[in-house]
């Protein structure tokens, strides 16, 4: 059983929602990435999404785009991202680790090579933003063979037939994008999200995590009440961007603590 599945099952028993923070590998520098990942875990992360820097991240808003740009300036690419994940795994064997990225860098190094590298780094799941389910069959099959979860995005505009198709391919969890725009966009309509999550669950037994637009503890708490996981990305990346170097770890720690307290309080 995958670490992702085990984590969600344990949290379900406790009536809790997973906190899933996102950071971009190599931002603000490669030397900071593993320390940041450890800080996330020490302050309540149930699993981590690690972004692969890419020059054209179409689903990402300005905050994460700039993080990608900074990482690329630091010469951090897909292989470096996997190496950083592997470094993290040297001291943390338990926390599920998910790579999030785009098809282009994966195809540039070759799918087989990518899967071989992430297996060696003990990656637990992959989100490939621009791999539609219709074209993902072989990729998903290869990941399944290595017991790596394939995580797909669903949006407010995803129709029921497509939800069914994605549900057949996906494993680990389903990632519901709460807004029609890019990451870090405007406010979430929590009632609409609740309705859509309920609809998704008609077609899949997988946990549903919600992301895009979770900007403060109040929103994190509201989202945790209606989902199995809360993805916090742009807000953390913004904290990294706006903090002086010596303040990054303390500020991320403080932010994580406030988000975790809010998420856990929803089950009280």
Label each PLM-derived region with a short phrase:
Residues 1-11, 54-66, 76-86, 106-112, ...:
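Active-site-adjacent beta->alpha loops and helix N-cap segments on the catalytic face
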Residues 19-23, 48-50, 97-101, 126-128, ...:
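Hydrophobic faces of well-ordered beta-strands that scaffold small-molecule active sites
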Residues 21, 40, 51, 118, ...:
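Conserved, mostly hydrophobic/aromatic
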Residues 24-29, 100-108, 132-133, 154-158, ...:
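Glycine-rich beta-to-alpha transition loops that act as phosphate-gripper elements at the mouths
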Residues 30-40, 158-168, 210, 214-230:
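Catalytic cores of alpha/beta
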Residues 45-56, 125-127, 176-184, 213-214, ...:
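Glycine-rich phosphate-binding active-site loops on the catalytic face of alpha/beta enzymes
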Residues 62-98, 141-155, 191-208, 251-268:
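Alpha-helix-loop-beta-strand connector modules within alpha/beta enzyme cores
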Residues 198-206, 215-221, 225, 230-268:
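Alpha/beta catalytic cores of nucleotide-metabolism and tRNA/nucleoside-modifying enzymes
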């Amino acid at each position: 059983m995958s670490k992702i599945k085990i984590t969600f099952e344990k949290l379900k028993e406790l009536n809790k929602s997973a906190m899933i923070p996102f950071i971009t590998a190599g931002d603000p520098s490669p030397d900071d990435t593993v320390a940041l990942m450890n800080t996330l875990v020490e302050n309540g992360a149930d699993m981590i999404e690690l972004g692969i820097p890419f020059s054209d991240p179409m689903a990402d808003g300005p905050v994460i785009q700039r993080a990608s740009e900074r990482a690329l300036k630091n010469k951090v690419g897909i292989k470096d991202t996997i190496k950083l994940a592997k470094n993290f795994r040297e001291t943390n064997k338990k926390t599920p680790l998910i790579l999030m990225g785009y098809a282009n860098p994966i195809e540039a190094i070759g799918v087989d090579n990518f899967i071989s590298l992430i297996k060696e780094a003990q990656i637990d799941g992959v989100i490939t933003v621009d791999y539609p389910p219709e074209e993902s069959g072989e990729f998903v099959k290869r990941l399944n063979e290595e017991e790596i979860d394939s995580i797909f995005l669903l949006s407010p505009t995803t129709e029921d037939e497509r939800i069914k198709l994605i549900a057949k391919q996906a494993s680990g969890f389903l990632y519901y994008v709460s807004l029609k725009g890019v990451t870090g966009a405007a406010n979430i309509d929590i009632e609409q999200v609740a309705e859509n999550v309920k609809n998704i669950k008609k077609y899949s037994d997988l946990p549903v995590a919600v992301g895009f637009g979770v900007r403060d503890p109040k929103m994190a708490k509201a989202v945790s009440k209606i989902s199995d996981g809360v993805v916090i990305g742009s807000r953390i990346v913004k904290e990294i961007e706006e903090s002086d170097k010596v303040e990054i770890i303390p500020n991320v720690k403080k932010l994580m603590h406030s988000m975790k307290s809010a998420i856990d309080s929803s089950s009280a």
